[in-house]
Every structure is written in structure tokens, then in C-alpha cells.
């Protein structure tokens, strides 16, 4: 059930549009300005495409492309012209929007950040990618956790970025904090296609949570991104899937946060996020409420260590042309000098 891509919208439905944006090549400030205009135009296209659409989602790297360029001249700020333009586009088109920026960081490497802006032009969600795609990406690891907001129709929404979604703990954190819809934006290329598909479905099923996932699309002359917009229902069933690889196509579906809430309350079999803390409640009252997972205990204690830790060969970005870092997490670049 997806309401024919949102054409037939139910009273409780939220219609999401995933933009499989053509992969750009952004090097200069002028390139950045042109790509900003392109995204603004696509917000308008989304509204013209489907009058029922509540939220339009742009992929990771939609503004900067896949070059991994950390040049401060093309990094964004929350009060900069790019974000200002996105805010205006949401107001002008009466639509919520999810956008990607590479954000200037005066204390270290840039952040890979995501924003959700409402139809009044207000930033409602601001997230910094927790898990950069190492060793390929140079971005500073995020430091503000995973926010969950109230979006269109009161839907509880979270945002994660690309590689984040390969960690089941990320989707679990979103759901634990109440998210009914988890957005996953990405710049992934074709070698990740199958992992992209099954993790999107697993993230939904394991948490009784809708996921809306989209990559960049097309080629910039060096890289080929795959599109693969996927909207997955809370039971893991795919509601909509962009399989043609057609750049600038908008994949749409209606999702039902009210049915997510209903399932979380009423499901017995496979209500996994509840049962995680209530193991074996048939045998013991309330189930076992403990933490039998060694890795969780060790992370909290700061002693997480793999049995093969000392054998791991790739532990910095030097294989991808980045200098080995000397600064520890939590220390500013200036303090490390």
C-alpha cells in the first residue's frame, strides 16, 4: 500500500518524495551557487510533480558532489546563502525539505550535515553524520547525536546519512527515541547496491519503522551513483523503489505513521524493539530486563576491543590519499598544533 505513489492520499498519510538527483561536479563558489539553484528548482519540481507531497528528500552530496573536497571556500554554514535559499524554497512551495551540506568546522575537518526544513522555512532537524564512510571520507565524526522531530502530520522523523545505515545500532537508536520514519540519504555507488537494499529493509523490519532512503544518481565523469530511492514499510515490505537509475526522477509513496504506532503497540510476534528489553516474557514476568551483550557493556566502559583488533590493516585514510591524523576525537585542530 502506497496510495499509488501518493496520488491517493489518506487522511493520516504522509507523502514522501525521494529525489534521485543528478550527481554534480562542484569545485568553485560559482559551481556551488549553480548547484544551489538546481536544488531549489527541484524543490519546485517536486511540488509541481505531486500536489499531495509533504516532504521532499535530497541525497547526501546533492550540493557538493562526491569529490571529498574540504576547501573552506565551498563549505557551508547554517546562516549561509545555500541554507537561506533552501529555506525560501520550502516556503515558496509549501513543502518540508531534507537537504545535505558539507559544513565548515573552524575546529577541525568539515562536518557532513543534514537538515530538515519545514514549510515555514524553519530548521527543525540538524544532524551531523556520526559514521563517515572511512577510509574514503575525511569528514569530522558527528558529535550531536540523533535528533528526532515532529514532522508533517505529527510524524516522528529521524535522519541518518549513508554509511550510518550500515550500523543496526543507528536505526535502533532512531526508533528507541520514537522515530516512526527514518530518512537515510546517501551518495553510494553501484558496488554497494545489494547492501543498500537489504540494510534498508532490515532497518525497517527490526524496528517497526518506515525508512525512506535515496542516493545520488548518474555520473559526474568520475563516479557513478545509483539512485535506488527506496521507501520501506515498517514490516520490511518495499513500497516504492527507483530501479531504473534515471537521474532527477522523484520516487514517491504515501506512508502511514499511525500504522507504525498501531503495530508497535499491538504486535506480539516480531515486536523486536520491545522484546530486546523483555526477553522471554512468556517464561518470566515482564521478561529478562538486563544487558547480556558484551559489546554494549564494553562500549559504555570505554573498553570495546575486537579479538582481531591488532590485525586490522586499514586504520586511517592514508590508503585514500589523506594524511594520517594526529588529533584525538574531542580535541580541536588548534589545540592539537
Swiss-Prot record:
Its EC number is 3.5.1.49. The active site is at residues 60, 129, 162. GO terms for molecular function: formamidase activity; N-carbamoylputrescine amidase activity. Residues 14-257 form the CN hydrolase domain. It is an enzyme of class 3 (hydrolase). It comes from the Bacteria. It catalyses: formamide + H2O = formate + NH4(+). Keywords: Hydrolase. GO terms for biological process: putrescine biosynthetic process from arginine. InterPro entries: Aliph_Amidase/BUP, C-N_Hydrolase, C-N_Hydrolase_sf, Formamidase. Is an aliphatic amidase with a restricted substrate specificity, as it only hydrolyzes formamide. Belongs to the carbon-nitrogen hydrolase superfamily. Aliphatic amidase family. This is Formamidase. It comes from Bradyrhizobium diazoefficiens (strain JCM 10833 / BCRC 13528 / IAM 13628 / NBRC 14792 / USDA 110).
Amino acid at each position: 500500500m502506497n496510495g499509488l505513489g501518493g496520488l491517493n492520499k489518506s487522511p493520516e498519510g504522509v507523502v514522501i518524495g525521494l529525489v534521485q538527483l543528478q550527481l554534480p561536479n562542484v569545485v568553485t563558489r560559482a559551481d556551488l551557487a549553480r548547484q544551489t539553484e538546481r536544488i531549489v528548482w527541484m524543490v519546485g519540481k517536486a511540488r509541481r510533480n505531486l500536489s499531495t507531497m509533504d516532504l521532499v528528500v535530497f541525497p547526501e552530496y546533492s550540493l557538493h558532489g562526491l569529490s571529498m573536497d574540504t576547501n573552506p571556500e565551498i563549505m557551508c554554514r547554517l546562516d549561509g546563502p545555500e541554507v537561506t535559499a533552501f529555506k525560501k524554497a520550502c516556503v515558496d512551495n509549501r513543502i518540508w525539505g531534507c537537504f545535505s551540506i558539507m559544513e565548515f568546522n573552524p575546529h577541525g575537518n568539515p562536518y557532513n550535515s543534514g537538515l530538515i526544513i519545514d514549510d515555514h522555512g524553519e530548521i527543525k532537524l540538524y544532524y551531523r553524520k556520526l559514521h563517515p564512510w572511512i577510509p574514503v571520507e575525511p569528514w569530522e565524526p558527528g558529535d550531536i547525536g540523533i535528533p528526532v522531530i515532529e514532522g508533517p502530520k505529527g510524524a516522528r522523523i529521524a535522519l541518518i546519512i549513508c554509511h550510518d545505515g550500515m550500523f543496526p545500532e543507528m536505526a535502533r537508536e532512531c526508533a528507541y527515541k520514537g522515530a516512526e520514519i527514518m530518512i537515510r540519504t546517501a551518495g553510494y555507488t553501484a558496488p554497494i547496491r545489494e547492501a543498500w537494499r537489504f540494510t534498508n529493509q532490515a532497518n525497517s523490519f527490526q524496528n517497526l519503522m518506515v525508512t525512506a532512503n535515496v542516493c545520488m544518481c548518474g555520473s559526474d565523469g568520475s563516479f557513478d551513483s545509483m539512485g535506488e530511492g527506496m521507501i520501506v514499510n515498517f514490516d520490511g515490505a518495499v513500497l516504492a523503489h527507483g530501479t531504473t537509475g534515471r537521474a532527477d526522477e522523484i520516487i514517491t509513496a504515501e506512508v502511514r505513521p499511525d500504522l507504525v504506532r498501531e503495530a508497535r503497540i499491538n504486535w506480539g510476534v516480531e515486536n523486536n524493539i520491545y522484546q530486546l528489553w523483555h526477553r522471554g516474557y512468556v517464561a518470566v514476568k515482564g521478561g529478562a530486563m538486563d544487558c547480556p551483550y558484551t559489546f554494549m557493556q564494553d562500549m559504555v566502559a570505554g573498553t570495546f576491543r575486537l579479538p582481531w583488533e591488532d590485525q586490522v590493516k586499514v586504520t586511517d585514510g592514508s590508503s585514500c590519499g589523506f594524511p594520517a591524523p594526529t588529533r584525538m576525537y574531542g580535541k580541536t585542530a588548534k589545540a592539537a598544533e
